[in-house]
A protein has these predicted regions:
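Short, contiguous acidic/charged loop-to-helix segments that flank catalytic cores in large enzymes
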Residues: 8-9, 39-43, 56, 93-100
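Well-ordered alpha-helical scaffold segments within catalytic/enzyme domains
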Residues: 17-27, 51-60, 108-117
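Non-catalytic C-terminal accessory modules of carbohydrate-active enzymes
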Residues: 63-170
Length: 170
C-alpha cells in the first residue's frame, strides 16, 4: 500500500545509502530507487542535489544527471530560499554554504563517468550527459585500486589507460 508521506519532496535520501555510495548490488532495487527519486523531485539544496546526481548516475540515467547538474550549477543568491546552486565564489549553497555540496557534486560527475562498485567490473561513461560528449579525465582511482585515464568523443570511449596502483585481492 502507498504510504501517505507528509513531505514527499524532502531532501534527505539516507535510506538510499545502499544504492549510493554503497555497492548497489541488488538490481531489483533499481525501480524502487528511481521511484523514490521521482517522488522526491529534482530541486533541492546543494548537498541533496549532489547526492541525487550520484544516485541517478548509478541508475545510468544520463538525462536526469544533466538536468540535476544544471540545477546544481545555477546561480544562487545568499538571500535565496532553500535551493541549490553555486554562489559567485563557486561554493555550493544550502544555504548557507556546505562543503558536502561541492565535494558531492564532483563525486556525482565522476560517478557519471566511471563506476567500479561491482566486483571485477569497471563501467565507462555509464551516465554521460549529452553536454559532456567529448572529454578526458586523468588519474581517477577505480576499485580495487586501478588508476584510470580516459578520453571520449561523441559519447564513446576512444582511449583508456589502466594501471594497478596496489595489489588486487579481488
Amino acid at each position: 500500500s502507498e504510504v501517505d508521506d507528509e513531505d514527499r519532496a524532502h531532501r534527505h535520501l539516507s535510506h538510499l545509502y545502499e544504492w549510493y555510495p554503497g555497492d548497489g548490488g541488488r538490481d531489483d532495487l533499481h525501480a524502487a530507487v528511481a521511484h523514490t527519486l521521482d517522488t522526491r523531485g529534482d530541486d533541492s539544496t546543494g548537498w541533496s542535489l549532489a547526492w541525487k546526481i550520484a544516485l541517478r548516475a548509478r541508475l545510468g540515467d544520463a538525462a536526469a544527471v544533466s538536468c540535476l547538474l544544471r540545477l546544481a550549477t545555477r546561480a544562487a543568491s545568499p538571500e535565496g530560499g532553500h535551493r541549490g546552486g553555486l554562489y559567485p565564489n563557486l561554493f555550493a549553497s544550502h544555504p548557507p554554504y556546505q562543503i558536502d555540496g561541492n565535494f558531492g557534486l564532483v563525486s556525482g560527475v565522476l560517478e557519471a563517468l566511471v563506476q567500479s562498485h561491482r566486483p571485477g567490473r569497471i563501467d565507462l561513461l555509464p551516465a554521460l550527459p549529452a553536454e559532456m560528449g567529448t572529454g578526458r579525465v586523468r588519474g581517477l582511482i577505480a576499485r580495487p585500486g586501478i588508476r584510470l585515464d580516459l578520453d571520449w568523443c561523441d559519447s564513446e570511449p576512444v582511449a583508456l589507460t589502466l594501471e594497478a596502483v596496489k595489489p588486487s585481492t579481488a
